[in-house]
Structures are given as C-alpha cells and as structure tokens.
C-alpha cells in the first residue's frame, strides 16, 4: 500500500508525503493517550448517525463492537503505531476500516478531525481533572489528620526566612489545607470550560447534516452545547483554564516542598523524613537528601512553562483551527502527569515526617521568637505605648545579641537597665514559649482554642467534598 493510499485525506494529492512531513506531522507518539476518549466520542457519534438515518442498526452494532475490539488491542499493545497515519484518531479509523470495510468509512460522516480532537481533549480533561480533584481532597485529608496530631507541637513561624513567632504545628499544616481548598475550587471552575460539546461543529462552519447535538451532549454526559461552530473547534480556553489551575496548584506544591527541604535540613532541623523517602550521595556518606521535594519543586517550573507555551502559541493564531494547536496536547499531558505524581509525593511526605520539638524550641529561643509577646505585655499590662514598647524590646534583643544570650538567660540586672518592667514572674510569663501560642486568641489564630475551632471548620470543609464525585 502506498503512502498516498494510507492517508485518509489523500485523494487530492498525487505525490507521496515527504519523510520530514511525516516525522514533523506525526502526533500518535503522544496523542495515543486520547484513545479512550476518541473511542467514547466515536461511539456517541455513531449512535447519533444512526438516529438521523446515516447508519443502520446493524452498521452501528458492527462499529461499536469493532471499536471495543480496537480499545482492547490498544490496551494490550497489539496495535502498531505508524507515522504515516499521523495520530491516534487516524489509527483508530484505519483499523476500523480494516475490520469492517465500507461500514467503517461511514463513521467520519458529519465530523472533522477539528471537532473530533477538541472533543477528545475536553473529555480527557474532565476525566483526569476529576482524578486530580480526588488527589487534592486526599492530600487535604492527610494535612487535616496530621494537624489534629500536631496541635500540641510548638514550632517557629517564619517571616523573611527568619524566626518570627511561636506557632502550633497544626496552624502551619492547616495553612496549606486552606490553600489547597482554593486549588480544589479552581479545578472545579476550570473543568466547567471542558464540560461542553464541540462535536458537531465540523471543520469550523458546521456540517451539511441535520445532526442531533443535544443527543450527543447527553450521550457524552456533558452539560451544554457550543453555540458557535468556529469557536467550538478553535477555542483552547478549556486547556488554558485547566493549565492555570495546574500552575497555581504546582506553585503551592513547590512552596510546600521548599518548606520540607528547609525544615528537614541540619540548619533548621524541625522535621525529619524517613530513609524510605530520601536518598544518599554517591560520594558523601553522611548525606540524606530530600529528593522527592526537590524534584517536585523542579517539576513546578515545567508546569509553569507548559502554561506559558500555550499562551504564547495562542496569542498569534488567526481564527479557527491551525495545525499549531497539535502542540497543545504535549503541554496538557505533561502537566496532568506532573500534577498527579506531585500530589502523591507530597501526601506521602506529609504522612511520613515527624516533628523535632527540641530543635524547634532551640530555634525559638535563639531567634527571640517571643519578643512581640514581651512588647504586648508592656502595652497591655504596663500601659506603655506600642511604639515605645517596640523600641524597648528591640533594645533588649540587641543587648542579648551583644552578650550572646537569649531572652531567657539574660541576667535580670541587664534587663532592668533597659526597662524596670523586665523583672520577675511577669517577665517570665511574657517571654514563655509554652504560653505564647495561646495568646493568639483572634479568629484564625494559633491558640489551642482557635486551633480546635479551625479543625472543626476544616472537617466540615472535607465533608462537603463528598458531593464532588457523585
């Protein structure tokens, strides 16, 4: 069989396609991942063709049976991919024609690859997007469970990567719980853009058949029909919105991983990862490297790049379909797979790590973490104006630094030299690490009472996710 005969669009051409055309034009090496969606869409399309009298009942039965066989062949690796057939859509149609002859050639009636492909991608996003949503919910549940067990663990909270104030470890974990809730809602919003029927738009102007697009919408379980054939086949907004959601999620993932990398380092040391989630060095025997966190941090850049790739590609395209759009799937597939494995990796690290309270306490003391509490003590108890209190405590910290001491072991005479109020039990309570967190009584704060309150709200948030997958 000649190259010309193998091309399903070859009637207009007399010359065989060049090698470079086939090599640069093939996409089956990556778009084979759409085979399930392509077969799902083709079955729905065939049923619609039967509804409008293009196919008989017997022909529909043959097509459905053969498409099911092709799906099995693809899953078992029995269908050979050929560059001359370009993409997964042509492979499936070509194989269908091999199996049932002329009947198979009827399937593409009232359909273009333009509307076929964009519909496949929409179905793919809906399916994989829901799996990502499940993974986000699973990660949020892991954060919630660890937060429940970490309420009584006091760790440093950091600003500018310097010790700032004591917080309960649960407050830290819940901060990411709520960030991921926003990611969850972003994905729910983004998936709505794919919940639309583009199939039936043809190449771009519609088709010369009285197709039943409402029937197709119901067959594919979609909520709406694209009202304009040109927009339906050419828009990639559904991919953009999905990649925006992936990007925001991966930015959060990267920052979580940055925390894990820092907090597990010898310089911080407030958490430990088990050996099973770390690696060693080929030359330095002492090393224990947080490779999962580092790799996810690196992968976040790829997902950001995928979004940028699509943005730049789309901004210069004229209306409707252009072959450039073939490249959108590379960005999409890579982002989906990267997000999925990153969520799994972060969940395992969160469930695995253990806090190191003694290192946390040392960092808090050496970092003067209760300096703000001491200033507030002067304001509340001694009626000192806050700016004056701020200056007095700042002076006290400077004295501690000069003497290489902390707020806890600076001799009382040196404290009194700064302020007469820096004495006795009142002073000790003001700088106490164990009391500091419970002084943060504002809503959303890190006191134990507010943490218990926040955990209840978090649990309610998780319960609401049960309806996402009904």
Curated annotation (Swiss-Prot):
Q: What is this protein called?
A: Argininosuccinate lyase
Annotated HAMAP family: Arg_succ_lyase (MF_00006)
The EC number(s) this enzyme carries: 4.3.2.1
Q: Which organism is it from?
A: Leptospira borgpetersenii serovar Hardjo-bovis (strain JB197)
Query: What biological processes does GO assign it?
Result: arginine biosynthetic process via ornithine; L-arginine biosynthetic process
Question: Gene for this protein?
Answer: argH
Q: Which InterPro entries match?
A: Arg_succ_lyase_C, Argininosuccinate_lyase, Fumarase/histidase_N, Fumarate_lyase_CS, Fumarate_lyase_fam, Fumarate_lyase_N, L-Aspartase-like
**Which PROSITE patterns does this one have?**
FUMARATE_LYASES
Similarity comment? Belongs to the lyase 1 family. Argininosuccinate lyase subfamily.
| Pathway the protein takes part in | Amino-acid biosynthesis; L-arginine biosynthesis; L-arginine from L-ornithine and carbamoyl phosphate: step 3/3
Listed under GO cellular component are: cytosol
Q: Which GO terms describe its molecular function?
A: argininosuccinate lyase activity
**Which taxonomic lineage is given here?**
Bacteria, Pseudomonadati, Spirochaetota, Spirochaetia, Leptospirales
